[in-house]
C-alpha cells in the first residue's frame, strides 16, 4: 500500500485550519487502516493538544487482501508497462472506446504471459476502477480481455487458479455493476468453482447487503445453497421484488415455502403489518420499505407468485379467504347499494364465491344480508349451507321462528318472489327477432358466420367474461352484430383452433374497409390478446384496422356547440348505459353484466343481454350520424379524423357548405375508402343512412349468402 511520509501532525493542521488529504474522524471500516496520534507536536517544537478521536484514514489499494486467505495481490506495474499505460490512458481520454483503443489493448494482451492476470493489474491501475461505467477505461480493459479470450479461444486451465478468480471477484463484487460482474464471471469462468464464493456471499448477507448477495447468487447460479431467509424474504421486505423473483424463478425448491410464508402473514389473528414487523425483528432486516408492507400489495404479490409457480390453492388458504371475503363484500355492495345485480346474477355469483366448505364465509354472507334487513335472503342462504341455527344472527333466528310459527317451512326457493324491485322506466330491448341471434359453438357455424361478416361494411363487437376478483380473466363470449344478425361465439365450447381465430382477425377485424364499432375496446382487445394470442387484432394509432371507439366519438361530438343528442340527459359518467339514454331514450339494463359467464348453459337473460350489448352500438352510431347530418356536419370527415388519430376540425370546418374540395392526402385516401363502402355521394341526396347502404351491399351478394346460409341453433333453440 502507498503511504505518505510527510504527514503533518493533526494538532498543527487544526491550528492552521487545514485538513490533510485522507483525514477523517469517522469510525473505521474493515478495509481501512487508522493511525491515532495523541499529544503530537509541531515541527517547531510546539506541542499541541490532540483529541483522542482524531484519526488519519489510510485507504488501502484495491489489491489489499484480495486473494484467498486475505492474501494481497500485487497491482504495481514495472517501469516500462507503467509508461505505456500512462500513454494509453491519455489516448483513451482523446479517442474513447473504439478500434484504436481495442487494437492497442489486444496487442498488449498478446505480448503478455498471462493476459488474465495483467487485465486485473490494468483494471486496478485505472483511475475509475471504483465506479466503472460501461464507457469507462476500467470497463474497457476487461471488455477487451473478454473479446481477446473469445477471438483466440483462450483457455483458463493453465492460466487461472482459484486465487486469481478470488481477486477478480473482489475487484468487481463491490462495484454493484451487474454487467461488469457477469462479464468477469464469463472471463474467469467462475461457474467452474462457484462454491469458492459462497462464504463471500454469506459475508454480504451478514452485512445486510441483500441486493448484492441476491444478484451474485443469481449470476453464480447458487440456487441450492441458500434458504428463503438469507436474502429472498429480506428483499421482499425492502421492496426489491425483481431480484427476489429472479432468484426464485430458478430456485424451485424455495417457491412453495416462500409463498406459504407470505400467505401466513394474512392470518386474521394479527394484522399483516404486525406479522411483517415480527418477521423483520426476528431476522434483523434493515432498510425496510414499510409503505409496501400492507394487505393490498402483499396479497397481489402472493397471488402472482402462486400463479407463476403453479402453487396449489391449498397452500395459500389465508389469501384465498381474504380474497373471497373481499369478493363477497363487493357482491353485496353491487346488490344492495348499486342495485345493479338481478336475482339470477346474484345467486350464481354467490354460489361461485362462497364454497360449500367455508363455514366462516357462509356465516359472513348471512350476516351481511341480515345487516341490510333482508332476513328472507339471509334465511335462504342459512338453509342452503345448512348452518346451525344457534350461529345465526338473532334477527335471522327470529325470522325463521316466525315462519315456523305460521306453520310454514322457511322458504329456500324464492323464484316466485318479486325479488327485484319494480322499475317503471322502460328498458331498451333488442329489435331483432330471436331467430337472428345465433350461438356459434362449432367450426361449421363459425365459418358460416365468417362468410357473412366478410361481406359487411360495418359491424359492432363486444365480449363477456366471468369476474374473477384478482385472478386472470378469460374471455367466455364474443358478440359480433350486423343490422340483420347477432353472432355470439362461445369461446369455451367452440373448440376453435389458432388458424380459425387468425382467419377472423385477418378477414374482419384487421381490414380497413370494414368499420368496427365498439365502446372502449382497449379492454376487450387486451383480453383477446391474453386468452387468444392467434386472434391478433391490431388496434393502435399506427394501425389501419378501422376500429372506432364510440366513447371517443362521444367526446368529440360534444365539442361542437351545435350538436345535440336526440334525448338530452344530464350524465356524470361516460358509460355505455348513459350513451344509450342519450341516443335511444331508454335505459340499458346491465343487471346481467356482472354474472357467471363461464357457466354452461348460459341463461336466456344472459344471451339476450349479450346480443343487445353489441347491437345497440350500431343504433348509437346511426343516431349520432343522423344528428351530425342534420346540423350539416360531415360524419365521414369526423370519422376519418378519429380513425387516423387526427383532431377533428372545428364546427365550421366540417360543414358541407363551407368545405373545400382539397384536403390532406392521408385523410382523403381514408375517406375515399369509406365513401366507397357507404356511397355517401349518393346517399346524402336521398337521405339514406349507412344502414340503407349496408342493405344494398348485402343484396349484391345475395347469391353467395344463399349458398352459405347460417344454420341454427339460434336463440329459439337455446333460450
Swiss-Prot record:
SUPFAM superfamilies from the UniProt entry: Ribonuclease H-like (SSF53098)
EC number: 3.1.-.-
Xref: SMART domains: 35EXOc (SM00474)
Cofactor(s) needed for function: Mg(2+)
GO BP of this protein: nucleobase-containing compound metabolic process
Family to which this protein belongs: Belongs to the mut-7 family.
Function noted in UniProt: Possesses 3'-5' exoribonuclease activity. Required for 3'-end trimming of AGO1-bound miRNAs.
Protein name: Exonuclease mut-7 homolog
Amino acid at each position: 500500500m502507498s503511504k505518505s511520509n510527510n504527514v503533518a501532525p493533526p494538532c498543527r493542521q487544526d491550528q492552521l485550519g487545514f485538513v490533510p488529504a485522507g483525514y477523517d474522524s469517522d469510525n473505521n471500516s474493515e478495509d481501512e487502516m487508522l493511525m491515532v496520534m495523541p499529544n503530537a507536536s509541531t515541527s517547531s517544537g510546539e506541542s499541541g493538544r490532540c483529541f483522542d478521536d482524531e484519526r488519519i484514514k489510510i485507504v488501502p489499494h484495491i489489491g489489499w487482501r484480495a486473494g484467498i486467505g486475505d492474501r494481497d495481490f500485487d497491482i504495481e506495474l514495472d517501469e516500462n508497462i507503467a509508461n505505456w499505460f500512462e500513454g494509453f490512458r491519455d489516448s483513451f481520454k482523446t479517442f474513447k472506446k473504439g478500434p484504436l483503443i481495442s487494437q492497442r489493448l489486444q496487442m498488449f494482451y498478446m505480448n503478455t504471459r498471462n493476459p488474465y492476470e495483467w487485465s486485473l493489474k490494468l483494471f486496478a491501475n485505472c483511475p475509475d476502477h471504483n465506479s466503472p461505467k460501461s464507457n469507462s477505461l476500467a470497463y474497457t480493459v476487461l471488455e477487451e480481455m473478454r473479446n481477446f479470450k473469445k477471438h483466440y479461444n483462450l483457455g483458463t486451465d493453465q492460466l487461472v487458479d482459484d486465487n486469481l478468480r478470488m481477486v477478480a471477484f473482489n475487484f468487481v463484487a463491490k462495484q454493484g455493476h451487474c454487467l461488469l460482474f457477469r462479464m468477469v464471471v464469463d472471463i474467469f469462468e467462475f461457474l467452474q468453482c462457484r462454491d469458492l464464493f459462497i462464504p463471500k456471499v454469506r459475508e454480504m448477507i451478514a452485512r445486510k447487503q441483500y441486493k448484492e448477495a441476491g444478484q451474485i447468487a443469481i449470476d453464480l447460479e447458487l440456487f441450492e445453497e441458500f434458504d428463503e431467509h438469507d436474502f429472498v424474504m429480506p428483499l421482499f421486505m425492502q421492496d426489491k421484488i425483481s431480484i427476489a423473483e429472479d432468484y426464485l424463478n430458478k430456485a424451485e425448491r424455495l417457491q412453495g415455502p416462500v409463498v406459504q410464508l407470505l400467505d401466513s402473514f394474512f392470518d386474521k389473528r394479527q394484522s399483516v403489518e404486525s406479522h411483517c414487523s415480527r418477521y423483520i425483528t426476528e431476522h434483523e432486516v434493515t432498510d425496510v420499505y414499510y409503505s409496501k408492507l400492507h394487505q393490498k400489495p402483499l396479497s397481489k404479490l402472493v397471488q402472482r407468485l402462486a400463479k407463476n409457480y403453479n402453487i396449489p390453492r391449498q397452500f395459500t388458504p389465508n389469501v384465498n379467504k381474504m380474497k373471497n371475503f373481499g369478493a363477497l363484500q363487493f357482491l353485496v355492495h353491487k346488490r344492495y347499494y348499486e342495485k345493479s345485480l338481478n336475482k339470477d346474477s346474484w345467486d350464481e355469483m354467490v354460489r361461485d364465491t362462497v364454497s360449500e366448505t367455508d363455514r366462516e364465509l357462509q356465516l359472513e354472507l348471512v350476516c351481511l344480508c341480515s345487516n341490510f334487513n333482508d332476513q328472507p335472503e339471509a334465511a335462504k342462504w342459512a338453509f342452503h349451507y345448512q348452518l346451525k341455527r344457534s350461529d345465526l344472527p338473532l334477527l335471522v333466528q327470529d325470522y325463521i321462528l316466525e315462519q315456523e310459527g305460521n306453520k310454514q317451512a322457511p322458504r329456500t326457493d324464492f323464484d316466485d318472489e318479486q325479488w327485484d324491485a319494480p322499475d317503471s322506466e322502460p328498458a331498451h330491448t333488442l329489435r331483432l327477432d330471436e331467430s337472428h341471434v345465433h350461438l356459434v359453438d362449432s367450426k361449421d357455424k363459425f365459418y358460416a358466420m365468417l362468410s357473412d361478416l366478410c361481406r359487411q361494411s360495418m359491424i359492432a363487437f363486444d365480449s363477456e367474461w366471468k369476474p374473477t376478483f384478482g385472478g386472470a380473466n378469460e374471455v367466455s363470449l364474443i358478440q359480433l352484430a350486423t343490422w340483420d344478425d347477432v353472432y355470439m361465439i362461445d369461446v369455451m365450447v367452440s373448440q376453435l383452433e389458432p388458424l380459425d381465430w387468425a382467419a377472423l382477425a385477418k378477414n374482419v377485424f384487421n381490414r380497413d374497409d370494414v368499420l368496427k364499432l365498439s365502446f372502449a375496446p382497449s379492454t376487450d382487445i387486451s383480453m383477446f390478446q391474453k386468452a387468444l394470442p392467434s386472434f391478433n387484432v391490431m388496434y393502435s394509432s399506427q394501425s389501419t384496422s378501422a376500429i372506432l371507439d364510440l366513447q371517443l366519438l362521444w367526446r368529440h361530438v360534444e365539442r361542437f356547440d351545435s350538436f345535440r343528442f336526440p334525448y338530452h340527459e344530464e350524465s356524470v359518467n361516460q358509460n355505455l348505459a348513459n350513451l344509450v339514454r342519450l341516443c335511444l331514450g331508454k335505459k340499458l339494463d346491465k343487471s346481467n353484466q356482472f354474472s357467471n359467464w363461464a357457466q354452461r348453459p348460459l341463461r336466456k337473460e344472459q344471451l339476450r343481454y349479450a346480443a343487445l350489448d353489441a347491437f345497440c352500438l350500431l343504433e348509437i352510431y346511426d343516431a349520432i350520424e343522423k344528428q351530425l347530418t342534420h346540423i350539416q356536419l360531415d360524419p365521414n370527415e369526423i370519422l376519418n379524423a378519429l380513425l387516423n388519430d387526427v383532431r377533428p376540425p372545428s364546427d365550421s370546418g366540417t360543414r358541407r357548405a363551407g368545405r373545400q374540395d382539397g384536403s390532406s392526402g392521408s385523410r382523403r385516401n381514408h375517406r375515399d375508402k369509406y365513401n366507397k363502402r357507404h356511397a355517401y355521394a349518393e346517399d346524402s341526396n336521398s337521405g339514406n343512412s349507412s344502414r340503407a347502404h349496408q342493405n344494398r351491399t348485402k343484396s349484391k351478394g345475395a347469391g353467395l349468402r344463399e349458398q352459405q346460409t347460417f344454420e341454427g341453433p339460434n336463440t329459439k333453440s337455446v333460450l
